[in-house]
């Protein structure tokens, strides 16, 4: 198969779909790999490294799209990239379609076969292609929140871990999954006063056993959430419903109960955000203030630590890419129901139910694509 990767063009996105090591694996299995010139510069991988791994360097993204049978990316294709997709071409990347009707319409119109990293599952029901970026984003959310709490950035002027004789910041993490766990781990490690909210008693039990006295856990209901948010210096939104738009758990009215200069970090912004007042921001302009509350809603947080993120991502995406290239997408999906769960759009149809439901579009079961 001819596999292609291009330079990411989303604002301040420095990751790349394939590392030179991944290219070497693909070419060693007999596949041709096309790499847009400069695609790996953000992780310190220059064209010569890709050439040594067996790739052919291509001058433009347009030529890569025109020649490749499968495009491997990191972030959802931007409008100019979507216009280059063609019927039957495979797109393998993060998509986050539920809150993005425009992208969904374009992918439907393209006729491409679109496999989303974030909905591929594993035997335990986890999301293995989302997990490493969730780990990165969870940890980064605390770094970003700590910076936003500084007075110069509009925050309360509170040090996350405090100092002897001065109380630490109160950090509230909404959601105890991969993002929430990593955020809580970082915040607790810095000495913050951490509370984690979740609706799953088993998750709360596991978190309680892990953190012991270093973090508190509370069941997530309206009353507990409102109380915790009102007391917080920093709130991390770490809620995920696989493939679906995130629920709006913190309302605009709740902001009025918060301390002025408190910070909201919405890690769920890729799926539309879990705060009513959230809208996507960029690394160039990461924050805005509503009712005195600082909002950090960068939609590609791991892009800021591109090298770590790219290698962590390739560790989990490459095996599936190899399988698709070796077998073709239909056979690969027939043999692996977990990879089949990643199929979001095929032949002009939405094949992931949560996306179809959220956008009010007709739903075609993914199984129809491999029948």
Predicted regions and their residues:
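Glycine-rich phosphate/diphosphate-binding loop of Rossmann-like nucleotide-binding domains
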Residues: 6-45, 152-237, 287
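General beta-strand structural signal in soluble alpha/beta enzymes
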Residues: 5, 34-37, 57-59, 73, ...
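Glycine/serine-rich phosphate-binding loop and adjoining beta1-alpha1 elements at the start
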Residues: 2, 8, 79-169, 298-300
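An N-terminal-biased, well-structured beta-alpha scaffold segment characteristic
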Residues: 2-110
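Adenosine-phosphate binding glycine-rich loop
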Residues: 118-159, 269, 274-371
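Short glycine-/small-residue-rich Rossmann-like dinucleotide-binding loops
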Residues: 69, 75-76, 95-96, 221, ...
């Amino acid at each position: 198969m001819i596999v292609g990767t291009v330079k990411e063009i989303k604002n301040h996105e420095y990751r790349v779909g394939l590392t030179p090591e991944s290219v070497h694996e693909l070419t060693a299995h007999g596949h041709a790999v096309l790499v847009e010139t400069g695609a790996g510069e953000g992780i310190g991988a220059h064209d010569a490294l890709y050439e040594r791994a067996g790739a052919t360097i291509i001058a433009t993204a347009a030529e890569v799209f025109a020649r490749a049978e499968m495009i491997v990316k990191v972030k959802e294709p931007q409008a100019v990239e979507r216009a280059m997709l063609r019927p039957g071409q495979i797109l393998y990347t993060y998509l986050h379609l539920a809150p993005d009707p425009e992208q969904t319409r374009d992918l439907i119109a393209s006729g491409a076969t679109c496999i989303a990293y974030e909905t591929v599952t594993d035997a335990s029901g986890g999301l293995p292609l989302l997990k490493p970026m969730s780990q990165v984003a969870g940890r980064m959310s605390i770094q970003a929140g700590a910076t936003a709490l500084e007075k110069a950035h509009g925050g309360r002027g509170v040090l996350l871990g405090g100092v002897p004789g001065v109380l630490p910041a109160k950090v509230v993490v909404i959601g105890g999954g991969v993002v929430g766990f990593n955020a809580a781990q970082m915040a607790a490690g810095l000495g913050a006063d951490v509370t984690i909210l979740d609706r799953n008693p088993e998750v709360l039990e596991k978190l309680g056993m892990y953190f012991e006295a270093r973090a508190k856990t509370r069941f997530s209901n309206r009353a507990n959430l409102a109380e915790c948010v009102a007391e917080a210096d920093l709130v991390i939104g770490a809620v995920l419903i696989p493939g679906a738009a995130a629920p709006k758990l913190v309302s605009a009215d709740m902001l009025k109960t918060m301390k002025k200069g408190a910070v909201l970090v919405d890690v769920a912004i890729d799926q539309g955000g879990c705060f009513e007042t959230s809208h996507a921001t960029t690394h160039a302009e990461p924050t805005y203030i509503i009712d005195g509350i600082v909002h950090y809603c960068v939609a590609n947080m791991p892009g800021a630590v591109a090298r770590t993120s790219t290698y962590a991502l390739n560790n989990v995406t490459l095996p599936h890419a190899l399988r698709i290239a070796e077998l073709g997408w239909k056979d690969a999906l027939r043999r692996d129901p977990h990879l089949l769960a990643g199929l979001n759009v095929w032949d002009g149809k939405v094949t992931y139910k949560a996306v179809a439901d959220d956008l009010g579009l007709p739903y075609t079961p993914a199984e129809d694509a491999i029948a």
